[in-house]
């Protein structure tokens, strides 16, 4: 009888220890390893979708800014931009600049902190009265690409919208300081 009680006590103690460890460290959510991000593409399209801004930021801190002005009757599909399908050259201009290395590091840290790679592809928020447009962010590493965003993305109060908004806030800040 004494041995059975000791075994029960030992098993109970082991289970309690395991539950405490899972509570403190999590149960395998996320890889824990920081992603080595090589490129971030950020697209902003206001509600009227006449002008679209696309920023391609590389790990060497270079920025290509595409200012797309839709002039033809052919509607621009935003997701096509991420596949390199730009409209005719008359419909956009391109300029180059650089973000600071600190700005790039801040962006990379935020993308890892928010576990952006695990965000849903559709972060749309349709309950808002104001039409702020569509926002998309694609991150690329040596092996993977992940695109998230949508209509009024980042404007909701749920967890994914808050994470998305924290990334676009950093993007807006570092792009405003780009030179």
Q: Residue ranges of each PLM-predicted region?
A:
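Secretory targeting and sorting signals
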Residues: 15-19
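Hydrophobic/aromatic beta-strand elements that line small-molecule binding cavities or substrate pockets
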Residues: 53-57, 94-97, 135-137
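A short-motif feature that recognizes glycine-rich, charge-decorated loops
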Residues: 72-119
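Bacterial N-terminal signal peptides that target proteins for export
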Residues: 2-14
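A short, structured loop/turn motif at beta-sheet edges
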Residues: 60, 97-106, 139-145
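Short, well-ordered, aromatic-rich surface patches in folded extracellular/luminal domains
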Residues: 30-52, 109-179
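C-terminal motif of bacterial Sec signal peptides marking the signal peptidase cleavage site
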Residues: 23-26
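Glycine-rich catalytic cores of cysteine/serine-nucleophile enzymes that process amide/ester linkages
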Residues: 47-87
């Amino acid at each position: 009888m004494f041995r059975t009680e000791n075994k029960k006590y030992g098993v109970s103690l082991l289970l309690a220890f395991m539950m405490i460890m899972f509570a403190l460290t999590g149960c395998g959510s996320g890889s824990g390893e920081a992603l080595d991000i090589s490129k971030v593409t950020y697209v902003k399209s206001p509600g009227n979708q006449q002008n679209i801004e696309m920023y391609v930021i590389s790990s060497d801190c270079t920025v290509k800014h595409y200012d797309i002005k839709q002039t033809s009757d052919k509607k621009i599909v935003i997701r096509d931009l991420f596949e390199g399908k730009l409209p005719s050259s008359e419909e956009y201009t391109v300029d180059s600049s650089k973000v600071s290395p600190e700005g790039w590091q801040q962006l990379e840290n935020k993308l890892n902190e928010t576990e952006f790679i695990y965000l849903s592809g559709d972060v749309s928020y349709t309950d808002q009265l104001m039409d702020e447009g569509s926002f998309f962010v694609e991150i690329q590493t040596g092996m993977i690409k992940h695109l998230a965003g949508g209509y009024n993305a980042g404007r909701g109060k749920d967890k994914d919208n808050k994470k998305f908004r924290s990334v676009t806030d950093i993007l807006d800040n570092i792009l405003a300081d780009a030179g």
